[in-house]
Regions:
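N-terminal signal peptide c-region/cleavage motif recognized by signal peptidases
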Residues: 4-13
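Cleaved targeting-peptide boundary
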Residues: 12-23
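Short N-proximal segments of mature Sec-exported proteins
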Residues: 21-71
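Compact alpha-helical subdomains of small soluble proteins
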Residues: 51-115
Length: 115
């Protein structure tokens, strides 16, 4: 009976840890996306070429980028511990690329609307 109670407690603690990691990863994503949106909203961005804006986005928000990267990797490692870290890194890189693609898409739409 004691072993069952300990197993349930450990399982509950792991579920809480995974839930907390998911929340932190989501907050990291939101922070990074909001920072990129801030770059899009800067008055100077309206006059940038597509290439210049893409270069700006690639180096923008380094602390938010790093936080999102670390938090998402932590979450994936907890949620899927048997999955190879390389797979998790690919997922993280895809999530970051998607956030950057979203702001680039908005920029391109705005550029198209002003031409």
């Amino acid at each position: 009976m004691l072993a069952l109670a300990l197993a349930l407690t450990a399982s509950s603690a792991l579920a809480d840890e995974v839930g907390d990691a998911h929340k932190l990863a989501s907050q990291g994503r939101d922070s990074y996306s909001n920072c990129l949106a801030g770059e899009y909203s800067r008055p100077e961005a309206k006059g940038m070429s597509v290439q210049d804006f893409a270069a700006d986005i690639a180096i923008a928000c380094p602390s938010e980028w790093q936080n999102f990267r670390v938090r998402l990797l932590d979450y994936l490692s907890l949620q899927f511990p048997s999955t190879d870290t390389g797979v998790h890194l690919t997922t993280v890189n895809h999530a970051i690329a998607t956030a950057e693609k979203d702001v680039m898409t908005a920029f391109l739409r705005r550029k198209g609307a002003t031409n």
